[in-house]
Amino acid sequence: MKLTPRRTELFFSLPELEKEFVMVKPTLLVLAAGMGSRYGSLKQMDGVGPSGEAIIDYSIYDAIRAGFGKVVFVIRHLFEKEFREIFTPERFGGKIEVDFVFQELDKLPEGFTVPADRVKPWGTNHAVMMAAEVIDGPFAVINADDFYGREAYQ
């Protein structure tokens, strides 16, 4: 069937289709469960900017400017208190939703077990899997202690 201008106009004015074209803001998934064994502390929380800003503050600022609507931190339970106290929506001017998920050794897909001598987190893929329940749209993944620059979020 050949589309005519009138048919196209009718097609795009259907109310049920309007819901499908809603702009979805992406989520920024921040991998922050590592301890920084060579560094000796949580370097993702250390201030480096002129007013004590952490590297992650710059990354989230750039993501907000690019239209991101939510940031999810992948952390370990061991660091939960510190992260919840520092990384609040108010820290970012209320311009982005903040959530936390946990990367723990025993959070594995069914049928997998933790080897007795395993003490380190499983890595990037495992960390991303931890956010599956809180991300339901487009997302980008970054490391908390790396600086990417504004262009990375466009």
Language-model regions: role of each:
Residues 6-7:
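Basic polycationic patches enriched in arginine
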Residues 11-22:
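Short, Lys/Arg-enriched N-terminal segments with co-localized hydrophobic residues
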Residues 16, 41-43, 130, 151:
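Residue-level recognition of conserved structural "scaffold" positions that shape functional pockets
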Residues 16-18, 50, 92, 121, ...:
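Intrinsically disordered, low-complexity segments enriched in small/polar residues
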Residues 21-89, 96-98, 137:
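N-terminal glycine-rich phosphate-binding loop and ensuing alpha1 helix
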Residues 95-98, 102-154:
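Conserved beta-loop-beta/alpha segment of the NTase-like Rossmann-fold superfamily
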